[in-house]
């Protein structure tokens, strides 16, 4: 077992009850284009087209063979694009239950499948995009082979669901999915929380992690178990995609159910809800929120994406929906107040010393300014890197030094705590993405 000593468990109120309920019915779903790093779509549908569940919506021009399939049957009501015609979303109004079927196997056949059979079925069904690479966090090429595959079956994000509750709901499908992964012919690492009982199968290497967030992030797992570099790549996926793999191979149908944590200070009844991949989040949260100007987040409060307008949908990789009150109100002479209702990792407010949960808002309590190296980054960074120097290089655009300091091991979510504790209010995620894009381009 690996225990993480550095990090931060954000003391935020309204964690979800770990019991699964059915969520609101949604009649719109979407595929979000900006989730897929470096993807350039070749559209296979137009607005007004009728599509079946599992039908190809678009293909990646830059990654031949990688297709993105419809999460529901219905009508394509919008294809939203942003600046420079970047694809934001393909929105489907859910109608009927027509679907495309894929190759089906008996459970007893799964352990004898070839790697080619596994790849072909995942690619055809559009489930190949469940894999992401490290470094760069991109969907892998269909003919690529990683050094290993990581299945993340733990979650330490604030307000997250307990993966064990969901996995045990789909125990057999999870085991089938693990069996399918083994047939790809590379080492499969299953990472779970210490002491938690979840199913596994022969051939899987099980690891346990304990400690504060980010103990549950896949970047932490990769760093300690099988570190990557510019010439070594690993893949990772989450436990709900493993369940979807198992469903696909034993039923021949695309499984698009998602169980997500609906939580946060503005949620009336925080709990786990069953919905569908790409669900419209305004519809999912109807009647669920307290009065106020709320920000709905697809994902964690630390690293999720604001869901509104053309991207008001559950992300492909999101396992939670978080809701915070917009922090619009200004506080007169707030800087001289003791701050008993505020939290900080430093001893600058009284709330630091109080063992309580806080109703966080989106307010950042200050404007962006220069980095201030007061040791805050080191307190929340458990990886074997020097965070202050790395963040300085990312801010300065020095990719050579950033690469030497370990930026290739990271994704935006791995720097989310550094962003949160930064006295200068700097957002390091976009800086990291800019550096990674430049490193990949320059080779």
UniProtKB/Swiss-Prot annotation:
Gene Ontology process terms (BP): sodium ion transport
Q: Does the record bear Ion transport in its keywords?
A: yes
Recorded GO MF terms: oxidoreductase activity, acting on NAD(P)H, quinone or similar compound as acceptor
Listed Pfam families: NQRA_2nd (PF24836), NQRA_N (PF05896), NQRA_SLBB (PF11973)
According to its UniProt record, the EC number is 7.2.1.1
InterPro entries attached here?
A: NqrA (IPR008703), NQRA_2nd (IPR056148), NqrA_C_domain (IPR022615), NQRA_N (IPR056147)
Enumerate the UniProt keywords alphabetically: Ion transport, NAD, Sodium, Sodium transport, Translocase, Transport, Ubiquinone
Q: Does the keyword Ion transport apply?
A: yes
Give the catalytic activity.
a ubiquinone + n Na(+)(in) + NADH + H(+) = a ubiquinol + n Na(+)(out) + NAD(+)
State its role. Answer: NQR complex catalyzes the reduction of ubiquinone-1 to ubiquinol by two successive reactions, coupled with the transport of Na(+) ions from the cytoplasm to the periplasm. NqrA to NqrE are probably involved in the second step, the conversion of ubisemiquinone to ubiquinol.
**Complexes and interactors:** Composed of six subunits; NqrA, NqrB, NqrC, NqrD, NqrE and NqrF.
The family assignment reads: Belongs to the NqrA family.
What is the protein name given in its UniProt record?
Na(+)-translocating NADH-quinone reductase subunit A
Originating species: Haemophilus ducreyi (strain 35000HP / ATCC 700724)
